[in-house]
Every structure is written in structure tokens, then in C-alpha cells.
Amino acid sequence: MKDEEFWVRRSATEALEKCSSPKILPRLCEFLLTTVDSSLLRWVLNTIAAIQERCKFYNYTLTEAILVPETQLKIPPIQLIFTSLMHILHLSDLHFGTLDQANLWSNQLAADLYNDINISHLDALILSGDIANYSTDDEYKAAAQFLDNLRQDLPLNPEQIILVPGNHDLNWKLAKKAYKPVYREDYDGQLIDGHYIEESASVIGVRDETEYKQRFAHFSSFYKTIKQNPYPLEYDQQYTLDHLPEQNLLILGLNSAWELDHHYKTRASINTNALSNALTQIRRNLDYKNCLKIAVWHHPLDSAYSDRITDQGFLEQLAVNGFRLFLHGHIHKAETSLFRYDMSSDGRKLDRICAGTFGAPVREWVPGYPLQYNLLKFEDNQLTVYTRRREELNGAWKPDARWLQGAGKTPLDYYAIAL
């Protein structure tokens, strides 16, 4: 790696990435303290990350067994590529309506995290859709107030807050306005299936495509309030990438409600162009290569109802591009399952983590399922998903022991996933 030729140095780091022993790590870390080549520094960091991933050896301390010359004492400490402990809060189907809800719910949640779970720091907060109820500005003001309250107890930067839209995050009134009534016999254009509505035997509602995209405008403005940039209204740009380098984490957000409106309520899907654009961006950024990759959207793959994602081929793309987990909501009950792309024990796979509803009106609760949320705890090579429940509107959160362990055994309020 000290060769004068660029291609030789690059080839050396690529070869070391295939190393199956962690014994080389001390020498690589020592090399980091001596190199001044910024490109080589990044390659070596990627090499270390690849070795750690292959060897499942994430807790190596870069300062151990390294003798630092006195002349280099001013070199800033190197960030660990993997963290040994990480907490992600997963909320879904919040259905905000009022500022009173924002104040009550944030207080109930912070009290639970602080007092019962003993959490005073979050690495990320994921809201997997249906943040509002009717996608109005007032509802998003309540959601923003909730987040502002929560961040005063648990500080979070904008990049640590992941937001994706659900079917309640598009405004039906704006969707209706985009359909223009026309007498069928007077319409000369091409009628594309799914782009118009049969209003009567003689009248159709033809969609104004530009105006139709505005049904996500209120969500987009809310997104800008929290994330500092508006949510894209063009469908092929409706993906988000939140990279948290300190946690070695990459979270992809997708819009599974991009084809939905007041009339077409069940066309949940993932836009193939948005997914392709996202995966291309991920592949071309070396900083993302060895990250733990999580995908988030709103709708389920399996459901008793028709409002589910039926075209599930995109899961294969996520699997071969290194994604390990996907999170969603919508069904108002916590669930988990596994998508296996390879059948080998160490093959490519994605664990599914579904959160229940955090704030839906009582009339929309699933029988037997109260309000719920998930707390994801990453430690070493294991993810533990803790499920919390709240039955009383003005009550407190508590453990949700619904994960069965076998006949005659006590159910647990958590389940574990080996990473």
C-alpha cells in the first residue's frame, strides 16, 4: 500500500478486503495513523469495515496495541466504523390531529424511554408513514411539535430523523381537484387505465398529472420543516437516503403510496424508477459500501385486505444490494417475518419489522392490539426488537409481551434477530 503507483495501492486494499482473519486489523489501524493520502485513507477504512463484516469482529478498539509517535499526538481520534450499541425508535401510523396530542404523546413516550427502558439517547428515529390523518397543515404542525418536544428530551439531528409517507399523508381534497370532469364524448385524448375516473355513464374525471402530484404538498412542507429540504413530488425522486457514518448505518426511505388517492385506495407499490435511482446512488458511493442497510416504507407485503404491495420483486433487488432489514406499518399491529433470497444459512435475507399504530383513533384499532411502538437495540451481531403497548388514551406505555416462546412458556416483550 506504500507503492508509488496509484493502481497498485488500490489493488492492495481491494485484495485485503477479502481477508478472512481479523489479525491484520492492528497493522491496518497503525497504517491509518501514518498515511497522509486521503484517498488511501478511505480505501483502508473500507477495507477494515469489510474485514470486520466478514469476520463478525466489530468491537476492535483502534487505540489498542498501537504505539503512537510523540510527533503524531495531535492527530484527531479515528471514528470507529461499527458501534457496539445503537438504539433506533420506530413509530408508525401516528395519525396526528391536534397540538394537545403532540404534547401528551411526546410526554408519555419520553417518560417511557427515560423511566422504564432507561434510554437517554437515540441514534435514529424512524416514522414509517401515516404521520397525519388527513394530510393537512394543522396536523403536520402537531407532528412537528411532537418531534420538537421529543428532541428536547432525546436530542436528534435532522439526518437522524427518517420520514416516509403513508396513505394518510396524501391530501384527498387536492387529489380530487386534480381530476377534471369531461364529457366522455368530448374527450379527444388517450384514456390511460388508472389515470381517470368513471364519474357516470357520460362523464369522466381526467387527471391533470402536474396538479395530481400536489396531493403530497403538505407532507413535503412538513418534511422540509424537519429535514430542511422538501420531499420530492416527482415519483422517480421519491426516495431518501439518510447516512449515519458514526453508526455505520444507511436508511433508504421509499413511498409506497405514490399511486394512491381518494378513489384508488389499494394501489400500494414501490416505484421502480425511484428504487433504481436509489440503488444506483448507493452503489456508486463507497461510503455506503459496508453500512448496515435498512429500507423503510409504509405498506405491508401481506395483509388480510387488498391495500398491500402485491408486486414484491423489489425485495430481491434490496437483498442483492446488501439490505438486511425492512420496516413498515399500516396494519396497526406489530409483526415480524423473514424474506429469504438465498436458502443457505448465511445467505442474503431481509428481516421484516412491522410496528403497530402509535396514535390511531380507537375506532381504527385492530381487535386485541392496543397502541404500540418498537425500540430497536443493536448490540454486537444481534438486533433485539422491544415492543411497547398502551391501552389507555391518557395512560402510560408498558411492555407488550406478545412474542410466544413455546407451549407452557411465558411470552416475551421482545424478539431477537441475528445479524
Predicted regions and their residues:
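Conserved beta-sheet core of the metallophosphoesterase superfamily
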Residues: 246, 304-382
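Active-site-proximal segments of metal-dependent phosphoesterases and phosphodiesterases across multiple
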Residues: 258-325, 331, 336-338, 344
